[in-house]
Swiss-Prot record:
Keywords annotated in UniProt: Calcium, Complement pathway, Disulfide bond, EGF-like domain, Glycoprotein, Hydrolase, Hydroxylation, Immunity, Innate immunity, Metal-binding, Protease, Repeat, Secreted, Serine protease, Signal, Sushi
Annotated Ca(2+) 2 binding sites: D131, V132, E134, N149, F150, G153
Organism: Rattus norvegicus
Highest classification ranks of the organism: Eukaryota, Metazoa, Chordata, Craniata, Vertebrata
Active site: H475 (charge relay system), D529 (charge relay system), S631 (charge relay system)
Protein name: Complement C1s subcomponent
Binding sites annotated in the UniProt record for Ca(2+) 1: E60, D68, D113
Annotated ranges, domain Peptidase S1: 438-680
Amino acid sequence: MWCFVFFSLLASFSAEPTMYGEILSPNYPQAYPNEVVKTWDIEVPEGFGIHLYFTHLDMELSENCAYDSVQIISGGIEEERLCGQRTSKSPNSPTVEEFQFPYNRLQVVFTSDFSNEERFTGFAAYYSAVDVNECTDFTDVPCSHFCNNFIGGYFCSCPPEYFLHDDMRTCGVNCSGDVFTALIGEIASPNYPNPYPENSRCEYQIRLQEGFRLVLTIRREDFDVEPADSEGNCHDSLTFAAKNQQFGPYCGNGFPGPLTIKTQSNTLDIVFQTDLTGQNKGWKLRYHGDPIPCPKEISANSIWEPEKAKYVFKDVVKITCVDGFEVVEGNVGSTSFYSTCQSNGQWSNSRLECQPVDCGVPEPIENGKVEDPEDTVFGSVIHYTCEEPYYYMEQEEGGEYHCAANGSWVNDQLGVELPKCIPVCGVPTEPFKVQQRIFGGYSTKIQSFPWQVYFESPRGGGALIDEYWVLTAAHVVEGNSDPVMYVGSTLLKIERLRNAQRLITERVIIHPSWKQEDDLNTRTNFDNDIALVQLKDPVKMGPTVAPICLPETSSDYNPSEGDLGLISGWGRTENRTNVIQLRGAKLPITSLEKCQQVKVENPKARSNDYVFTDNMICAGEKGVDSCEGDSGGAFALPVPNVKDPKFYVAGLVSWGKKCGTYGIYTKVKNYVDWILKTMQENSGPKKD
């Protein structure tokens, strides 16, 4: 038993690899002992095999060498078991048994049972290192492609376009690293349509510009990859990965997935993995970038150019607002802007929108007002009104304006021009009822003669015919380019005049046919006794101030004998004193001969020297007349063919031979053309 242990310990001892060696059974060449187990570990250098041969074998014979035996073991597997006797097979060779193994390690185990009836001497064996052809001597081929043997080893090599993996045995294709950036392309497995290489991992990358989504197209007949095994596992496979999406792995004869794969990404990774076997042709696919769409509407109330059913990445459109709408950015408005479909599927300038044009707060008008509008945007309507009853609108339909597409308030008749409130002429707020003469007549109110203008020095009168114009007699303003004038007061008291409107003169325009004379007292020719005074500022109309109408040129405005007209003024009375309260009266028109027959009161003039023309009207009756201080005031007649009382200036107080009798009035109808032309040529106030 101790002997068994001793030999076992010796057998487990390992030494450095050697090129050759000798193995002898215990006690050789004497009889080997019973109950012995001994092991020899043989190791030659890497890259060599072992040639083992026996020159002597003499052991107990038994069935299957069950009693005594020599075992040859490689990698735990019994290669051979020997027992019995052997003799040389060749007379020239001492070898009785020999073996050659392609491995560089072997175990030889000697075993004897508990008794031997005969004397057996055991065995003698020798081993040596021999070169191995690894490329042919093994069942498993060591190289995937080309195997190259040399003494003590071998090396593997690969065909062109292949490379040797780190295991130095298998070849693969260098098919990774390709990056595709074109919007349209085709990708195929290596060697397609020839069989693809084994033991390879091909990685392809598609990297498109942001704003495109990758779409793959694969025909079934363009896909041939080693089918899955019985458990459904793909040893060769094609896989697609796009951000958070994965498609595959796919394998088989004919593409098993959808023929069109639409990703939501502009990047895609393709992985084609193969194992060591297979003779399939591989695959081919096509891809293209599908541009990301943008919503069709950026801003309502707009027109797009060009018009398309679908807008996609990089499309540029011109967006034009429809009439009445505009794009407002800051304080600047425009009717159009450009927008580009961006890579994120959103339009540039999406913050801009077509908003209704805002016409803004309507401008105020003189002597009128505009109602507060509910809104001031496109389509809104406003109404202007004049300050009634003292003003009226020049155009009957001129009060309604709508907010137009161009951002202006527009009237159907006037366009963008603002309405004008024209003073109502010839309508007193209180009709004159007392029929008393001025010369010694009764007082009246300014409301009955709102057109009456008071000239302070020399005292005289005038007629307001427009907010900028006063009509008077030429001799009232002769030699006075800046007369002091008031309107709106009945009394000439200082405190009352303070509350009246003082009129500031812009210019005095005397009729060009009026003959200038230095001394009024000696004047006998009052032909063309008419003048206009233009005012610097407009007169504000009201219950005490209003213009009188001008006559028209039709025959209806020809004064006729017997017509009753109104006169007013602050001239002297029969006791030859000037009054401070306005007086008025009704006077009939009479024939010019009646005025010619009046005895002259002026001691400096003869009756026959006075000039009478068709430019004059004679009016009055005994005791009813105008007098000094009334000059220039209006002789008012009712406007013909109107329902409500309205007056026009038929004449201007001009002169008379004697107060309290018949007086001469300048016939205004003869000067209407000159009046209108002069007013037009000097329209508006003079600006400082």
